[in-house]
């Protein structure tokens, strides 16, 4: 299979991209590779994942290494891929620069990554203290500068919140991979406008998403607006709700909780008494495919260019086939409009499965 994606895709460049979210925390790496191949065959346009060492719950039970998996996924599909990751503690920024440059060299134009300030559940393994959010944000910005310089082929020495001594990457891509800013708050989106090549967030109440997009754009933010959408679908409303409650109830808490807890066990502890109503605040739950299509179309109207669909269940086949046949065609006909979208207001600001 050629490494470059064939030019001239199936869909217009002006049409919204609808991608598949590959949830390493919930599905084994081998099965997830099959799932993303299935998603491509069914008609999804792209894929993304998050770089975790710890799942959000023991019930999820997985957490393969995203960077190893990405090489296999890029080599065995023609999709474009992105990954949310966190340089600065678990990873030295030169390692992220090296890994991302190598993928971009082998698969030009098909890889982006979203460097975030991190989550303690992944970063605590170093044994280093967990910094406050503002310090993590400044550390991230140093890492972004280091990574960009390394991608340009420079030899980098840097001493600050991270230390780099005479680092150089010998194989650099002709076009460096875009660095997309992950954010779940208005303040983070505004701050990211200074450095990011785009913005990625998760489904939240429409006013919050609108404010985030405005903060990013008003601050001079460039590039695409990307939305990861947590959803649950099944043959009945009851089953769809049960799937979401089982798999995603630990992801219903607003920051700083998702940033600061250290393990799946801690998340399971605070999620013990979460009910269906709270889960519905973080996950779009419906048995109706038309309802999901309407939600997704509303996100397009808000101004998002790319949607990555995360079915929160662990068995992906039925979701992939049903959404490819019934939902994706409806979403692709949606146009950004000045009319107010009819997104239902969520009851909680959901936790991201991405560093922010």
Where are these regions (language model features)?
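Active-site-adjacent structural elements that line small-molecule/cofactor binding pockets in enzymes
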Residues: 2-356
């Amino acid at each position: 299979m050629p490494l470059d994606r064939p030019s001239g895709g199936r869909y217009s460049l002006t049409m919204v991209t609808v991608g598949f979210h590959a949830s390493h925390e919930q599905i084994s790496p081998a099965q997830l590779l099959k799932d993303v191949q299935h998603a491509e065959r069914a008609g999804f346009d792209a894929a993304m994942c998050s770089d975790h060492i710890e799942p959000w719950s023991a019930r999820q039970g997985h957490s393969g290494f995203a960077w190893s998996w990405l090489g296999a996924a890029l080599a065995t599909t023609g999709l474009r891929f992105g990954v949310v990751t966190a340089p600065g503690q678990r990873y030295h920024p030169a390692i992220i620069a090296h890994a991302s440059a190598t993928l971009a060299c082998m698969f030009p134009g098909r890889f982006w990554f979203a460097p975030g300030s991190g989550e303690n559940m992944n970063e605590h393994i170093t044994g280093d203290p967990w910094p406050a959010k503002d310090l993590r944000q400044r550390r991230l910005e140093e890492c972004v500068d280091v990574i960009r310089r390394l991608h340009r082929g420079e030899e980098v020495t840097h001493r600050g919140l991270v230390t780099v001594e005479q680092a150089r990457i010998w194989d650099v891509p002709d076009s460096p991979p875009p660095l997309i800013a992950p954010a779940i708050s208005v303040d983070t989106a505004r701050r990211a406008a200074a450095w990011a090549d785009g913005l990625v967030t998760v489904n939240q109440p429409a006013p919050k998403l609108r404010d985030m997009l405005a903060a990013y754009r008003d601050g001079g933010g460039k590039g695409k607006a990307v939305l990861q959408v947590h959803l649950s679908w099944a043959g009945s409303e009851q089953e769809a709700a049960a799937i979401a409650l089982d798999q995603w109830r630990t992801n219903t808490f607003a920051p700083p909780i998702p940033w600061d807890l250290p393990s799946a066990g801690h998340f399971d502890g605070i999620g013990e008494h979460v009910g269906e109503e709270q889960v519905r605040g973080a996950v779009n739950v419906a048995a109706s495919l038309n309802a999901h299509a309407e939600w997704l179309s509303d996100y397009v109207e808000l101004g998002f260019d790319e949607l990555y669909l995360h079915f929160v269940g662990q068995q992906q086949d039925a979701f992939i086939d049903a959404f490819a046949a019934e939902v994706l065609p409806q979403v692709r006909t949606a146009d950004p409009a000045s009319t107010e979208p009819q997104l239902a207001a969520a009851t909680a600001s959901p936790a991201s499965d991405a560093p922010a």
